[in-house]
């Protein structure tokens, strides 16, 4: 079935290549390896990096394209999902038609192309969310348990996307002739988790202020001088999502109350193995029965902004307080990508504690499936 559909979209030769590449073994990379490799962005290293991506990206992209064709409950035929599949097939075609990379000019041309591929895939998450939303509207009786298969696919799909974007972004960033201090590509070798948490919290409060007119305070505790190597954009995204959920929960709970809204507390702890960031709120918590659902892509405690009047063209521009229920599961994937994790503990009637664990060691390879 999958091959037939891919044959309809691509030439016979290219469709066979998709199938062939989709069966090949992926090669995982660790944060430490990326750092060691990025220490010297010499022309030789950039050439090796481009040659690796030229071989690796088609394998990863082909796997996802094939999987997008074989989703249960008719999800593969939803217009939004077909659009995403076509982006993946276009990117596969671009990569496979690029000639062997032998010199600096080849490498620069390749870098320009993968940069365009990254932009092409910018809106994959909201467009896939629209496809899921279309399915939920058709099958309103589906419980999240029934959709376990789709949830597992989305975990694999989004984890793969994080990896693809990290590899491309890292390669492109190594070309920067004037990188910011202490940066090796995307990686900040002396990142202050406190500083990133502060910026992310202010961004989350800003959205709350726009939506509600006021926002609870966020207090941050920890050693301001502590730094470790990590990807600041990843950490910002994770803390932003956690704080956004917390400020919304507290704001809605205390909106009509005479009491002052209690602050969100962020604690940064630096252990030997992990850096742990705890985000605590008094927003009323989540019922115990709802806790397993918060890590699924089909559940949100807030109104879902992906209504039927949205199209794949404008869905990505929707910026609301609640998002589309993907922030928590995707944050956990970002944490796990470099060997960390995200746990959430809730006290119904009081509040929620989120524990974001980040590996300090940097030697865990990408979790590829």
Language-model segments: residues:
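Signal-transmission coiled-coils
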Residues: 3-217, 228, 232-236
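Glycine-rich nucleotide-binding loop
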Residues: 274, 285, 325, 347-355, ...
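Short conserved segment of the HATPase_c
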Residues: 286-314
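Two-component histidine kinase transmitter core
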Residues: 301, 359-364
